[in-house]
């Protein structure tokens, strides 16, 4: 999977297909807050997402409180957003 930074146009196009994901102010990253029925559902999501992240060798920044999981994605080695971030965001949307 390519680790080249996306152009602004590529990122904007990708975001139109990623429900709920937005650019992070002051940083080259994308973020989304997921809400679930309860803690078990939130933790289940994190477990499934972690397995996909490991397969991609690309790991999210995330924060969990009860039924909410806040996720931020960026490719640190590229100091920006790459196709890996978009692929993981798509997978997270699909399993949420």
From Swiss-Prot:
This protein's record includes keyword Thylakoid: no
Q: Name one GO molecular function term.
A: 4-alpha-hydroxytetrahydrobiopterin dehydratase activity
Q: Which GO terms describe its biological process?
A: tetrahydrobiopterin biosynthetic process
Catalyses which reaction(s): (4aS,6R)-4a-hydroxy-L-erythro-5,6,7,8-tetrahydrobiopterin = (6R)-L-erythro-6,7-dihydrobiopterin + H2O
List the keywords (alphabetical).
Lyase
EC main class here is: lyase
Q: What EC number(s) does its UniProt record assign? A: 4.2.1.96
Tell me which Pfam families the record gives.
Answer: Pterin_4a
TM annotation in the entry: none
Q: Which residues form a coiled coil?
A: none
Query: What cystine linkages occur within this chain?
Result: none
List the InterPro entries hit by this protein, alphabetically. PCD_sf, Pterin_deHydtase
Protein family according to the UniProt entry: Belongs to the pterin-4-alpha-carbinolamine dehydratase family.
Task: Provide the protein name.
Answer: Putative pterin-4-alpha-carbinolamine dehydratase
